[in-house]
Every structure is written in C-alpha cells, then in structure tokens.
From Swiss-Prot:
Record flagged with keyword tRNA processing: yes
Keyword set includes Nuclease: yes
All copies of domain RNase III, residue ranges: 10-135
Its job: Digests double-stranded RNA. Involved in the processing of primary rRNA transcript to yield the immediate precursors to the large and small rRNAs (23S and 16S). Processes some mRNAs, and tRNAs when they are encoded in the rRNA operon. Processes pre-crRNA and tracrRNA of type II CRISPR loci if present in the organism.
Compartments, record wording: Cytoplasm
Protein name, per record: Ribonuclease 3
Domain spans labelled DRBM: 161-230
Originating species: Anaplasma marginale (strain St. Maries)
Enzyme class per UniProt: hydrolase
Binding site for Mg(2+): E48, N121, E124
CDD domains, sorted: DSRM_RNAse_III_family, RIBOc
Subunit structure comment from the entry: Homodimer.
Length: 232
C-alpha cells in the first residue's frame, strides 16, 4: 500500500461531506478497502458495523419526529426504505465517494470504485468514523442533509420488505425469531455473491443469495416466508 496524503484526503472528504476530520488515521481506516489492507492494517469493516447502526438510529429518530401519527409498522417500513442499500449507494455516488476509497489499481480497473456493495460499506463506515471523530453533531448534520428531504417526501408507507414481513409473521404466531447466518462469499471482489441462511426453530432453514449480505438476507427471508406460508 503506497503512502497516502492524509491531509489531501481529508480536504477531499470535507469538500464532499462538509465535515472536517480531526483524526486522520480514523478517516484512513474508513476509506480503506478490506482487500487493500494488510493483516496489521485497519480497513472499513468495523466502522461499517458502527455506521450502519448510527444511520438506522438517526433515521429512526427523524421519522419519529416527522410522522407522529404513524404506528411502529409504518415507521419501520419507511426506515427500511430509506436505509436500504440502493439509497445508500445513490448518496455515495452523489458525493463522489467511489474515487476516494483506497483500493488496489486492479480493483479499481475492474469497477471496484462503483461497486454497490463497496460504496454502501464505505459510506456507512464514513458515518461511523464521523460518529467516533466528532460525536452527534458531526454525523447528524451529514445524515440530515442527505436523508431528510427523502424522508419528508414519504407521504406513503412503502410495502414491507421480506425481512420485516417475516419478523412480523413469526412474532404474530409466537414463533422463535429468524436467525441469519452468512454461509459463504464467492466470486470476484467487484462482483461478489453472498449466501445467507435463515432459520426458524422447528421450521428448518432456507438459503438466499445476493450481491451483498443484506440483499442475500432479504432473498432468504422471502424464500422462508414463502415456505412457511405454504405450511398446512
């Protein structure tokens, strides 16, 4: 991995997001692709885990305030629609994040900088890094800038996504909650295939695949829902 001009990278991120990072090593971690990092180097995976939770929490609060008459189910479906991968990827592309992700030349040549899974992961990692670097004001400002208008225009309640529908189905019948497990990841890095297994106690398991872990979970949930609704 070649040396990175951290100050130049921080300036580009400031121009893209409006946030000035203080901890440049943290920013570097948020933008480092897992395939580029060495065993001793950090990459964006841990910050992605954190950023995913921060984004979900902030959008949840936003919707709670915007739609005081919506029940839990409506709010959940709206949140799911707002934080789904395609929305996150669209925002990542709008700020030119792909060109700022640190990856190998081969990865970039194969389209890695515009890979939906990479863009989604990197933007969530960047949000997680904002949280760690500057606290609530840092990430709230960015999330509100890019998600508030989208939320305000949700005058309807989106249809349930398969994971939410499956969860509500089993809860309504007193069944054990679905458990999701990543079984495998195959294919080239710029076009991966994830396989996720969903299981419900005493009702077996089903395997779903997709170009990201989240899409594979949704596919598995859809297939499981089809299976259990066809039970006698």
């Amino acid at each position: 991995m070649h040396p990175v001009d951290k100050k130049s990278l921080a300036l580009k991120i400031y121009e893209a997001t409006g946030y000035q990072f203080r901890d440049l090593d943290l920013l570097l971690e948020a933008l480092t692709h897992p395939r580029l990092s060495y065993k001793s180097a950090a990459n964006y995976e841990r910050l992605e885990f954190l950023g995913d939770a921060v984004l979900s929490m902030t959008v949840s609060e936003m919707l709670y305030r915007l739609f005081p008459d919506d029940d839990e189910g409506c709010l959940t479906r709206k949140r799911t629609a707002l934080v789904r991968g395609s929305e996150v990827v669209e925002i990542a592309r709008s700020i030119g994040l792909g060109e700022l992700i640190l990856m190998s030349g081969g990865e970039r040549t194969c389209g890695g900088s515009d890979n939906p899974g990479t863009l989604e992961n990197a933007l969530e990692a960047l949000i997680g890094a904002m949280y760690m670097d500057g606290g609530p004001e840092a990430y709230r400002s960015f999330i509100h800038k890019h998600w508030l208008a989208r939320a305000q225009h949700m005058s309807y309640t989106p249809p349930q996504d398969p994971k939410t529908a499956l969860q509500e189905w089993v809860q309504g019948r007193g069944w054990a909650m679905p458990l999701y497990k990543l079984v495998s990841k195959s294919g080239p890095e710029h076009k991966p295939v994830f396989a996720v297994e969903v299981s419900i106690q005493e009702h077996g398991n089903v395997l779903g695949t997709g170009s990201s872990k989240k899409l594979a979970e949704q596919e598995a949930a859809k297939l499981m829902l089809k299976k259990i609704t066809e039970l006698p």
